[in-house]
């Protein structure tokens, strides 16, 4: 990537959101603060993401913050992706980009953005939503969108369901220990 392309990519990361593609959500029976803390810990990703077996902390930081990058190694052993958090609004939102992967997605969908938002639901529940944004300017990108859109949505929902189970099970085990 040339310096001009890198600068343009960084500008887009910070100032422009590509077109909306899909959104998945789940209600987790835990307070917003608990869900936020769990989601902020990058090392927890393999405990709830059904396809991630290992996370490498490229920035050396285990907690999310703008500019932190990490590599996710996927089950099957031959694929990985690098994710970078570019925006964090405490207790509300995390925006992540995908600068590198071995599937070739980043070569076709150059502006892929994932936005995770959290909303308090009553006193003890949290709605977490993951929205996907990317442009599909070329025929190849349009075809990839057509083919992969449902798979991305399904795998994202599986990830959210995994997070829900991990957080709720952790809460249940704490309650059991206290009893």
Regions found by a protein language model. Give the residues of each.
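Hydrophobic pocket/interface hotspot
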Residues: 34-39, 45, 70, 85, ...
